[in-house]
Design a protein with these regions (language model features):
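Hydrophobic residues within beta-strands of alpha/beta enzymes
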Residues: 34, 67, 97-99
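Conserved catalytic cysteine-centered active-site region
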Residues: 62-70
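Generic, well-ordered alpha-helical segments
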Residues: 18, 46-50, 66, 74, ...
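Active-site-proximal glycine-rich helix-loop-beta segment
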Residues: 30, 63, 93-95
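Structural motif
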Residues: 37, 70, 100-102
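N-terminal beta1-alpha1-beta2 module of alpha/beta enzyme domains
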Residues: 1-61
């Protein structure tokens, strides 16, 4: 059985030292993976860091723990760029990235991006 943990980004906010320390402690405890949330916006929430960028920071502070973003909203991003970012992070972390993609479920996020919520499935298939 593999057991991981979610990075409490809202609680740790922008404290880079605390984020690194949390990731290192998770690794030292033998947890298999560290999950980083993916949300473009969330009204009333604290910091919502971009997950691939945040995982690059974590990769530099750890050696073994698997890096797992929650499902990346692919239709909200440029697909080739996501592929390049993910491949780079995976290579630079020694193959520790586990990537999942999906279409998202919150219309508020697509509205904030000026994108059509209703054709997100078709955009993801492209």
């Amino acid at each position: 059985m593999k057991i991981g943990i979610s990075l409490p980004v809202r609680e740790l906010q922008d404290d880079v030292g605390a984020i690194k320390a949390f990731a290192q402690a998770a690794e030292e405890l033998g947890l298999s993976h560290l999950r980083v949330p993916e949300q473009i916006i969330r009204p009333g929430s604290g910091p919502l860091h971009e997950p691939l960028t945040l995982m690059a920071l974590i990769a530099g502070a750890t050696e073994k723990i698997e890096l797992v973003p929650s499902v990346i909203m692919l239709p909200a991003r440029q697909t080739v760029l996501v592929a390049k970012q993910a491949a780079t992070l995976d290579r630079m972390s020694g193959g520790r990235l586990r990537l999942g993609v999906g279409i998202g479920r919150d219309k508020v996020e697509y509205d904030a991006l000026g994108m059509d919520f209703h054709n997100r499935g078709a955009r993801c298939e492209e």
